[in-house]
């Protein structure tokens, strides 16, 4: 079992234990212990928190060193840094920053704040467009839920109306309930328990 775990192969099945789901992939092999995408420029401080605790907006953008970027003829990813807003900044246009300056400007919470689980500020990468998009999706979901509720209520009322007995059936049931049913002369009044 231990050797199978080290080699990454699945262990032999054990009797009495069901293997319903596949074994989770060991993410420790893919990600280093500190949050650094290993594509950042050398010399930048690595973030102190674990990768699973930070939202994607806090992770470094994939950038190459300036010499490589200049040799390739410009940035490799046309979108630029993830956490930088696309529109003009409220305090006016500013000169474009190098990837190292962008990386240093994006704040990363310290590990105790990230681990505390308390209320956190919005991530610096959350753009106004994304917030509007989230609001639109929320409004669409609410409208869909309201439509489904109205449709359910309409169907329920139709079912009630469809299964309502006719007045003739109500009268028949009333008379049959009031009339004594003919019984055998030896039959008891009531069935014993």
Curated annotation (Swiss-Prot):
Residue segments, region Disordered: 1-31, 71-131
Record's keyword terms, sorted: Apoptosis, Mitochondrion, Phosphoprotein
A Pfam short name: PUMA
GO cellular component terms listed in the entry, alphabetical order: mitochondrial envelope; mitochondrion
Phosphoserine: modified positions: 10
Motif stretch (BH3): 137-151
Main location: mitochondrion
Compartmental location: Mitochondrion
Regulation: induction: By DNA damage, glucocorticoid treatment, growth factor deprivation and p53. By ER stress in a DDIT3/CHOP-dependent manner.
GO biological process, one term: T cell apoptotic process
Known role: Essential mediator of p53/TP53-dependent and p53/TP53-independent apoptosis. Promotes partial unfolding of BCL2L1 and dissociation of BCL2L1 from p53/TP53, releasing the bound p53/TP53 to induce apoptosis. Regulates ER stress-induced neuronal apoptosis.
Record text about domains: The BH3 motif is intrinsically disordered in the absence of a binding partner but folds upon binding. Folds when bound to BCL2L1. Also folds when bound to MCL1.
Family statement drawn from the similarity comment of this UniProt entry: Belongs to the Bcl-2 family.
PANTHER family with a match to the protein in the record: BCL-2-BINDING COMPONENT 3 (PTHR28639), BCL-2-BINDING COMPONENT 3, ISOFORMS 3_4 (PTHR28639:SF1)
Subunit and interaction comment: Interacts with MCL1 and BCL2A1. Interacts with BCL2 and BCL2L1/BCL-XL. Interacts (via BH3 domain) with NOL3 (via CARD domain); this interaction prevents BBC3 association with BCL2 and results in CASP8 activation.
Name the UniProt record assigns to this protein: Bcl-2-binding component 3
Organism: Mus musculus
Gene: Bbc3
């Amino acid at each position: 079992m231990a050797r199978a775990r080290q080699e990454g192969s699945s262990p032999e099945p054990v009797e009495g234990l069901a293997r319903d789901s596949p074994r989770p992939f060991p993410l420790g092999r893919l990600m280093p212990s500190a949050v650094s995408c290993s594509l950042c420029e050398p010399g930048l401080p690595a973030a102190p928190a674990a990768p699973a605790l930070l939202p994607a907006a806090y992770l470094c953008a994939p950038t190459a060193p300036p010499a490589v970027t200049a040799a390739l003829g410009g940035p490799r990813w046309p979108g630029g840094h993830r956490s930088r807003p696309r529109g003009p900044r409220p305090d006016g246009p500013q000169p474009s920053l190098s990837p190292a300056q962008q990386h240093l400007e994006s704040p990363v919470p310290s590990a105790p704040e990230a681990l505390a689980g308390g209320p956190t500020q919005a991530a610096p990468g959350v753009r106004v467009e994304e917030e509007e998009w989230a609001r639109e999706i929320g409004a669409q979901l609410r409208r869909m839920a309201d439509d489904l509720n109205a449709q359910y209520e309409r169907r329920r009322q139709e079912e009630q109306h469809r299964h309502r007995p006719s007045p003739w059936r109500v009268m028949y049931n009333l008379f049959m309930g009031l009339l004594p049913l003919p019984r055998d002369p030896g039959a008891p009044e009531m069935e014993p328990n």
